[in-house]
Design a protein with these regions (language model features):
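Active-site neighborhood of HAD-like aspartate-dependent phosphohydrolases
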Residues: 1-52, 158
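A general structural motif
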Residues: 3-5, 72, 125-128
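Short catalytic/ligand-binding loop motif for oxyanion handling, primarily in non-cytosolic enzymes
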Residues: 16-20, 25-26, 75, 84-88, ...
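Short, acidic loop-to-helix structural element flanking the phosphoryl-transfer center
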Residues: 27-38, 42-76, 85-88
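Short amphipathic alpha-helix with an adjacent loop that forms part of the alpha/beta core around
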Residues: 1, 116-123, 160-163
Length: 163
């Protein structure tokens, strides 16, 4: 399954970027760091490397997206973030681990439903695909609205031809 000439919206956290489980204290200290604005691009890249140091790029999904992109698809990341700074750090992380793969990173407010955003800006939902790890929150509503939607696990199983 490779798509052609579509807009693919893909989630960042636990979809493209695979996180390890953080202990509660580490999560709190990480969130505290987000309140410090970083204006220098190199400093932001270094911060992104540190913050996402134990994260892995989902290379199977990345290869799939690259094939789609080579077939005329546009690939956009949708991320729910309270802080614009963290969305910028995600852009930097993608530039490091997936240069040229992503056409745009779109920050939605925390808790905003991605399907509602997609439905509000896309005229032809037949040319849209959503890939997200949250089945109940994102995939089911997308399918109800007629938007083609998949979990990263489904894409990876299909890419490996295992179903």
């Amino acid at each position: 399954m490779i798509f052609e000439n579509k807009t693919i919206y893909v989630d960042f956290d636990n979809t493209l970027c695979l996180f390890k489980q953080l202990p509660a204290t580490e999560e709190i200290s990480t969130v505290t760091e987000l309140n410090v604005p970083i204006k220098d691009d190199n400093a932001l890249r270094n911060w992104a490397r540190k913050y996402y140091k134990d994260c892995a790029f989902n290379s199977v999904l990345g290869c799939f997206l690259l094939q789609c992109k080579n077939n005329g698809c546009t690939v956009k990341v949708l991320t729910n973030e309270a802080w614009p700074f963290k969305a910028q750090a995600k852009k930097c992380w993608l530039q490091i681990y997936a240069p040229g793969l992503i056409d745009d990173v779109i920050r939605l407010s925390e808790g905003q439903i991605k399907v509602d955003f997609i439905h509000s800006i896309e005229k032809d939902i037949k040319n849209v695909i959503l890939i997200d790890d949250k089945y109940s929150e994102q995939i089911k509503p997308a399918l109800r609205l007629g938007i083609e939607a998949y979990t990263p696990q489904y894409i990876m199983l299909d890419a490996c031809d295992v179903k």
